[in-house]
């Protein structure tokens, strides 16, 4: 019985640690990769929207449409998770009390808020303009957040 209690406790601790991993400042994650993930999720949402709009006739297609809707929703949620759990809670910080620092901080927050809103709109509709707006707002954030070296690294990931 003690052995099973030990195993259960060990598994509980391990899974808790794995789940909490993204909430600690470990330095494992890469900012540029998070941006690329958001771009990839957005393009998947766009693909889902296009499929949904063009395939709504018979039951077989309706089944596929349902699957694409679920796909679109999941990718939009992933974008919201990356923005809120990674950038907003861990990366975006007020550097100092200067006006320049405060202005940059507010601009970054606004850009990420717009990405969150666009992801929400992608969940609510199949209007592909929302994916365009999402990518535009993401690009605005990239320009505010990354220095020239970071932007170069992003381009190399394409």
What are these regions (language model features)?
Residues 5-15:
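Bacterial N-terminal signal peptides
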Residues 16-20:
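Sec/Tat signal peptide C-region and signal peptidase I cleavage site
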Residues 21-60, 67:
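Immediate post-signal-peptide N-terminus of mature secreted/exported proteins
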Residues 41-51, 79-82, 111-114, 118:
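Amphipathic, well-ordered alpha-helical segments in soluble domains
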Residues 49-90:
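Alpha-helical segments in soluble extracytoplasmic regions
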Residues 63-70, 102, 106, 129-137:
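Short, charged, amphipathic alpha-helical segments
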Residues 82, 86-123:
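Long, amphipathic, charge-rich alpha-helical segments that form helical bundles/coiled-coils
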Residues 112-158:
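C-terminal amphipathic alpha-helix
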